[in-house]
Amino acid sequence: VLFRSCWVALTYNKKNIRKYMEPNENLVIVIAFGIPANWGYNHKSKLPRQVSNVSDNSPQWFKDGVDCALNAPTAINQQKFMLTLVDDKVKAKAKFAPSAKVDLGIVKYHFEVGSGKDHSIWI
């Protein structure tokens, strides 16, 4: 069975969800999982060079990490992040966007999965 997921940060009614939360819980995003009624469409994705300093001479793990990061869901599918290879480490920066810090965390996780590196890769 194939499932789809979607996360939403700005376009939902928080009052309807708060009734299911404890008073000390903080709501950041909502994630929906399920089998879609229709499969929607693919969103346009940026090129690796638009979100990183990747080049022909970059190590394969960095190229693979950037490719995987481009598949990370971001707010309004804007992909407003920059991954910069500095020596053997990576600097990740969020550009101004709604939910930029949430986006960057998801992007960094996708990069780690694609590159085969762990959290120690980050500057």
Label each region the model flagged:
Residues 1-123:
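Acidic, surface-exposed loops and disordered segments
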